[in-house]
Structure formats: structure tokens, C-alpha cells
């Protein structure tokens, strides 16, 4: 969900999910947080072994809460040559309040935001797990 960079897109995805949930069905997803993106900040990372090497250039705009990164991979082929792959990604750090509003706007009920241990998410949580529920639409009757 972090790849959705606009609030309206988050609402639309939640609406689409809600359309396909069974009555009282559960929607569970995870998000990287502002805390996580701040922790990696504007840094470069690299690693190499015999089969794959990568360079990751990261940039986090704290005001917009947009994380941008360029990733260059070198993957060894069967003939021992390396093929280069370049990728560019943007992700957004939505606040829990934004997610709650998007879920409620889409017609679902926001249940909780927890960390990897099942405890309530805090400002220091790197990845938050969101749990929402469909409100209980009436199932279609047999024809």
C-alpha cells in the first residue's frame, strides 16, 4: 500500500477491497511508517556476492512523506556475464489517522493498527499492520 502516493488512491483501493469482501470479512495489510523511512533517510546501500550485486540510492522527503529510491542490480547470467537492471520506486508513509479515515471513507470499520508483535503501533514502529472489517452488507439471496 506504500506504493500508493496519493490519499485518494488509498481510499479507492480500500473501496475496491470492500466491494469484494464477504459480509464482516477482514482486510489485513501492512505499511512501512514515517519512522522507518526517516531511519533510512537519504542514504546509499550496496551489497555484492558472486551472483547478485546492488546499489540502492535512497531519498526521503519528510515534508511530503515520499520515499524515492533508485535501485541498480547486477545479476550473473549462466555464461558468467552480469546483466544490469535499473528500477525506480516511490512510496508514501501514510499516518495511521490517514489510513483510518481512508478505511472509514471506503465503508469499512477500522479495527486496529499493530506492530509485528501484536502490540498497538507507536511512533517508533517501523512497519504497522492494519486490520479493518467490512461493515456487514447483506449477502445476495439465492435466486
Q: What spans do the regions from the language model cover?
A:
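Solvent-exposed loop and beta-edge segments used for protein-protein assembly and interaction
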Residues: 23, 63-65, 124
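SAM-dependent methyltransferase
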Residues: 7, 28-98
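C-terminal lobe and adjacent flexible extensions of AdoMet/dcAdoMet transferase-like proteins
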Residues: 90-143
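A short glycine-rich, Lys/Arg-flanked "PGG" loop and its adjoining helix->strand segment in the class I
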Residues: 10-26
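A short SAM/SAH-binding and catalytic strip from SAM-dependent methyltransferases
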Residues: 1-9
Amino acid at each position: 500500500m506504500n506504493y500508493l502516493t496519493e490519499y485518494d488512491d488509498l481510499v479507492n483501493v480500500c473501496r475496491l477491497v470492500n466491494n469484494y469482501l464477504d459480509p464482516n470479512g477482514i482486510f489485513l495489510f501492512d505499511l512501512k511508517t514515517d519512522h522507518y523511512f526517516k531511519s533510512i533517510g537519504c542514504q546509499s546501500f550496496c551489497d555484492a556476492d558472486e551472483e547478485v550485486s546492488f546499489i540502492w540510492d535512497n531519498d526521503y522527503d519528510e515534508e511530503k512523506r515520499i520515499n524515492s529510491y533508485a535501485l541498480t542490480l547486477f545479476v550473473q547470467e549462466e555464461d558468467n556475464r552480469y546483466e544490469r537492471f535499473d528500477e525506480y520506486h516511490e512510496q508514501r508513509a501514510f499516518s495511521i489517522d490517514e489510513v483510518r479515515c481512508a478505511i472509514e471513507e471506503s465503508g469499512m470499520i477500522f479495527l486496529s493498527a499493530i506492530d509485528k508483535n501484536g502490540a498497538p503501533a507507536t511512533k517508533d514502529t517501523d512497519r504497522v499492520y492494519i486490520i479493518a472489517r467490512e461493515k456487514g452488507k447483506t449477502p445476495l439471496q439465492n435466486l
